[in-house]
Amino acid sequence: MSSISVGQENSGSIELYYEDHGKGKPVVLIHGWPLSGASWEKQVAALLAAGHRVITYDRRGFGRSSQPSTGYDYDTFAEDLHKFVTKLDLRDFALVGFSMGGGEVARYIGTYGSKLVSKAVFIASVPPFLLKTPDNPEGVDGSVFEGIKKAIAADRPAFLTAFFNNFYNVDVLGGKRISDEVVRYSWNIGVAASGKGSLDCVSTWGTDFRKDLSRIDVPTLVIHGDADRITPMAATATRTHKAVKGARLLVVEGGPHGLTSTHADKVNPELVDFLK
């Protein structure tokens, strides 16, 4: 098992589990909540076939990485990513973020710059700013996030069942573009994540990435489904597309939040073409 230490909590090392396959231009894939690097299975296969070096890692608290009690904020996540790419000595790499992972892409470039980054991809991502504030009236009211936290604290497994039904739009796509087994597989990954980490991450969904996006100066692709119930396109991708100079927007018709699984046939060719 490959892992990299990004910190310490008491006597234990905080380790990030990762997988590093193939040769060629490196691509770092950053997963969403509450999943792990395993959620990129269909994209890893496509990118390897296209001749890339493909690297996935599990965010702290998720997948096979350590589950510390602290550090569930985007400054720390970006620092973890910085330590990770530094220890792997990556150069000229593409960053691809799904959902929450798009926040790492934005905060990493906003904090550390794009000197080592070749391209950026946001897939069904949370930026630019989900929280409703006086200067962001299009955002989501904070009470919604508080309600989610209460539901997770009360019964996280039950919350995840409802969450993944909306993640994949099971009522519409079940038995067609998504199987019960894939939904159950996602639930199994999610329920095995850190309970505290899962809860703490909800607060990060209100992070303001507007300044980070303004600092992105590499070719950027934004991919989003127009049927996304988790991060609706109008509040996220449409605005990210406008915020990043020269960014290209790909709208996947009928695509839910989990479109990397349900619509991999649409996502993968565009991703491979953009990263070549």
Where are these regions (language model features)?
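Conserved acidic catalytic loop of the alpha/beta-hydrolase fold
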Residues: 76-93
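Conserved alpha/beta-hydrolase catalytic His-Asp/Glu region
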Residues: 128-131, 135-139, 150-214
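Catalytic active-site module of serine/aspartate enzymes centered on a nucleophile-bearing elbow/loop
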Residues: 245-276
